[in-house]
């Protein structure tokens, strides 16, 4: 610093006497001294600090990615909420005058003012679904059955049939007179077909008695196999009893089978041989149907012409 001050004083003395020319070496030394002084003044307040040790502000790294995901998720939820709001607005038809499709009353009544498309309706406890006064309540299924269900009881209305399923039973009342038109409570009411119903289609029926009116016949028809079974026996009574079937008839009992009445067998459907056939020719085995005086039927194999029922092992005993 002293050398710099002396040089400055000498310069001032020389400058007072006029401009002084310096050599190249003196200029280089003076320039180097000025640069050193400038650099020392610049570094006087500088303290080098590592950037990793500085306090970081903002969201960086994983926190930044998580923040971006949260913002995108909130945006998607906002768009979905907007779409749901628009759909509800279009379906319910909310306008300046209120809701055009339904009305809410203080009594808890919800009234639909136009045709409504619904999937499943769950009425609350002790609630009622009905129509307006002097108007019909029309319920339509789009190519699907309409099902009314409460517990195990179910009413299904389809295109070609209506079925009712219940584990307890069912009763049909006249809404005006409250008279029972049809009931499955057989202990209290005798089972009768409703007026206008000509036939009853069931897969299995358990009852004590099946009867018909005095002026009509009782017809039991099945497509496959019919089984009539009684725990204490089966009794069939009628003026005329006819069995028509395409297969076999099997009468099976633990003790006995009693046919009390006139038994007729139509021979038109029984196979018969022509008069020219031989008695034992071919693969045919012929039998003759015989009957005892007490009505017992038995068969006798035909082994020759003009053969009768007088055989030794017939069940009639001495009476033929």
Swiss-Prot record:
Annotated TM spans: 68-88
Region (Disordered): 1-34
PTM description: Disulfide bonds are present.
Membrane topology of this protein: Single-pass type II membrane protein
Keyword Nucleus appears in the UniProt entry: no
Cytoplasmic domain ranges by topology: 1-67
Pfam families noted in UniProt: Sarcoglycan_1 (PF04790)
GO cellular component term of the entry, any: sarcoglycan complex
GO BP terms in the entry: muscle organ development
Annotated glycan sites: 160, 213, 260
Keyword Oxidoreductase: no
Localisation: Cell membrane, Sarcolemma; Cytoplasm, Cytoskeleton
Stretches assigned to the Extracellular side: 89-320
Keyword list, A-Z: Cell membrane, Cytoplasm, Cytoskeleton, Disulfide bond, Glycoprotein, Membrane, Signal-anchor, Transmembrane, Transmembrane helix
Coiled-coil ranges (or none): none
Disulfide bonding pattern of the chain: 290-316, 292-309
UniProt feature, compositional bias: Low complexity: 1-10
Extent of Basic and acidic residues compositional bias: 23-34
Known partners and oligomeric status: Cross-link to form 2 major subcomplexes: one consisting of SGCB, SGCD and SGCG and the other consisting of SGCB and SGCD. The association between SGCB and SGCG is particularly strong while SGCA is loosely associated with the other sarcoglycans.
Protein role: Component of the sarcoglycan complex, a subcomplex of the dystrophin-glycoprotein complex which forms a link between the F-actin cytoskeleton and the extracellular matrix.
Family statement: Belongs to the sarcoglycan beta/delta/gamma/zeta family.
Record's protein name: Beta-sarcoglycan
Species whose genome carries this gene: Mesocricetus auratus (Golden hamster)
């Amino acid at each position: 610093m002293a050398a710099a001050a002396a040089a400055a004083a000498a310069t001032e003395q020389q400058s007072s006497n006029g401009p002084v020319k310096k050599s190249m070496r003196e200029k280089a030394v003076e320039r180097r001294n000025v640069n050193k002084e400038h650099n020392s003044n610049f570094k006087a307040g500088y303290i080098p600090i590592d950037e990793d040790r500085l306090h970081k502000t903002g969201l960086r790294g994983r926190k930044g990615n998580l923040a971006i995901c949260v913002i995108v998720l909130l945006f998607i939820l906002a768009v979905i909420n907007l779409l749901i709001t628009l759909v509800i607005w279009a379906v319910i038809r909310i306008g300046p005058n209120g809701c055009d499709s339904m009305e809410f009353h203080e009594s808890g009544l919800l009234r639909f003012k136009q045709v409504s498309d619904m999937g499943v309706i769950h009425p609350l406890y002790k609630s009622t679904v009905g129509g307006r006064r002097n108007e019909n309540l029309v319920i339509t299924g789009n190519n699907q059955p309409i099902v009314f269900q409460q517990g195990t009881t179910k009413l299904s209305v389809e295109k070609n049939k209506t079925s009712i399923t219940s584990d307890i039973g069912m009763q049909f009342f006249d809404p005006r007179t409250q008279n029972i038109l049809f009931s499955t409570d057989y202990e209290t009411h005798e089972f009768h077909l409703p007026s206008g119903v000509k036939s009853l289609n069931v897969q299995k029926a358990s009852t004590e008695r099946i009867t018909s009116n005095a002026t009509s016949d009782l017809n039991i028809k099945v497509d496959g196999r019919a089984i009539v079974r009684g725990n204490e026996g089966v009794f069939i009574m009628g003026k005329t009893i006819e069995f028509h079937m395409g297969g076999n008839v099997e009468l099976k009992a633990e003790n006995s089978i009693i046919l009390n009445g006139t038994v007729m067998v139509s021979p038109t459907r029984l196979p018969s041989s022509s008069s020219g056939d031989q008695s034992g020719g071919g693969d045919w085995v012929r039998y003759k149907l015989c009957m005892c005086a007490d009505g017992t039927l038995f068969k006798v194999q035909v082994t020759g012409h003009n053969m009768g029922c007088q055989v030794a092992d017939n069940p009639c005993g001495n009476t033929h």
